[in-house]
Amino acid sequence: MKIGLISPYAWDVPGGVQAHIRDLAYYYLDKGHQISVLAPASDESSIVENFVVSAGRPVAIPYNGAVARVLFGPVAASRVRQWVAGGDFDVLHLHEPAIPSLSLLACSIAEGPLVGTFHAAAPRQKVTFAIAPFLEPVIEKLRARIAVSEIARETLRIHLDTDALVIPNGISKEFYEKAEPNPAWKRDLTIGFIGRFSEPRKGLNVLLEAFSRIALALPEVRLLIAGPGEGVEAMESVNPALRSRITFLGRIDDVAKASLLKSISVYVAPNTGGESFGIILTEAMASGVPIVASDIPAFSHLLEEGKYGLLFDNENSSDLADKLIRLLKDKDLAQKYSRSGLDHAARFDWNQVGDEIMNVYLHARGEDEKVTLLSDARPWSRLFTRGEEE
């Protein structure tokens, strides 16, 4: 099958949606399918995958408590049109087609076997509310809609009064399960955090507030932090006497991330909101590391209300400290969560998730139908393809 995938976000900026699309592409390539991915890119030379086509440089906009780098407008529409016209796709899979992006452009320009995946969880998305009347006739063109979680599904219902099939984000369970720990990182009583800690919603400040109390109860405890951001600035809130126990590793690749998860005693996800899934939690479970996470809806649902990890009261650093101390002291409890998490991680393996998505493709495609372009006479096509005539 010839499959076209569209990323709304810049390919050269790390993010959960981009990682999902990349891994899905590799999974289908391994199955013998032909894949092409269209994505914005700030630096085209940084793209290493030969199946990725750059649609141009994105612009940064505030979105869902973070900064999204997206591409939109008539020039971008022209590039989408050229890519679709030359792709001869059996199915076109659009990610986040409800925000101004390449995916929305493609949904307006193309017709046929179109599938949309909705990742975001934001009940008060101002942008989507503002353009909802224009979105509805476009989103209706999707033959199938996927939401990565019940939280994302509910967001779709609120904004666009439509429903979706829930298929979670995928991971390679074997990749994380078989990773080797890093001797420089592995030590008892080690807490790990991975994320863009420059974004307040990732909750690093909550973890750092909790760390002082944890250190009093467990003098040997230490904290490893990985991800983009300024470690010096983050450390300003930490007691100087404790700073030697905290190490900032900077941005790390997937191999180092898997090794880090194998090297720590507990993974903590103190995110305060804006999450629809929690891919890092599935990766941690696949690594066999017990989890302490905030009780935001996405994490509570993923961990089944504490069945697969300890939950603490969101933004409550005292409760976070109590839960981490409890898990670090109670080896039996930690082992229980390690085993149950490993079992639960199988639900998110690409061997299952990829096959579920393929079934959606087959249902959307019907009898050997192809993705085609709409006529220029259609209103949405005229709106988004004016750049071709300039």
Q: Model-found features: residue ranges?
A:
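Membrane-proximal helix-turn-helix segments that form the acceptor-binding/catalytic region
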Residues: 122, 127-145, 157-159
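Conserved donor-binding/catalytic core segment of Leloir-type glycosyltransferases
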Residues: 183-202, 208-212, 224
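Short alpha-helical donor nucleotide-sugar binding micro-motif in glycosyltransferases
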Residues: 251-252, 259-264, 279
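Carbohydrate-associated surface elements
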Residues: 151, 170
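N-terminal strand-loop element at the rim of the active site
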Residues: 7-12, 22, 26-74, 228-231
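Short hydrophobic beta-strand element within catalytic cores of glycosyltransferases
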Residues: 266, 290-293
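Nucleotide-activated donor-binding/catalytic signature segment of Leloir-type glycosyltransferases, i.e.
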Residues: 235-256
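Conserved acidic donor-binding segment of nucleotide-sugar-dependent glycosyltransferases
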Residues: 305-306, 310-317, 326-332, 346
